[in-house]
Amino acid sequence: MQRKNFSSGAKWEDIVGYSRAVLVGNQLEVSGTVATDETGTVGKGDFYAQTKFILQKIEKVLNQAGLEMKDVVRTRMFVTDISHWEEVGKAHGEFFKDIKPATSMIQISALIDPDYLVEIEVTALRSDIESSIDRSRMQMWNVKS
């Protein structure tokens, strides 16, 4: 299966040894994404603004890989203060209201920079490529494809 790595050009990708996203077959995995750009942290102190910026950033890498937000099947949201879940959820809902991917929102003690309040990972599947799923196993569990 072919693998394609996507880079944002951030210096940390080479230092830490990771890619912004990796496409293998029909599956794209997007690395943990925070609200930062070339000027620094976006939306300091604002969970909603950071979440919205992060999802816009994720949408860009999805587009680079030939996917769209509608192809997202899973999101993982890591937040430094779960009491702000409604702000994070509101921004997430603006992007995924009609898509409704599987999701998790998890409180963590800290992110790599104290100004980062939210980090999001995404899994997306290209629907135009036939999946390599073993359909016979799905029938065994009475799962409809």
Q: What do the predicted segments below correspond to?
A:
Residues 1-145:
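Short, polar/acidic, helix-capping and beta-turn segments at strand->helix junctions
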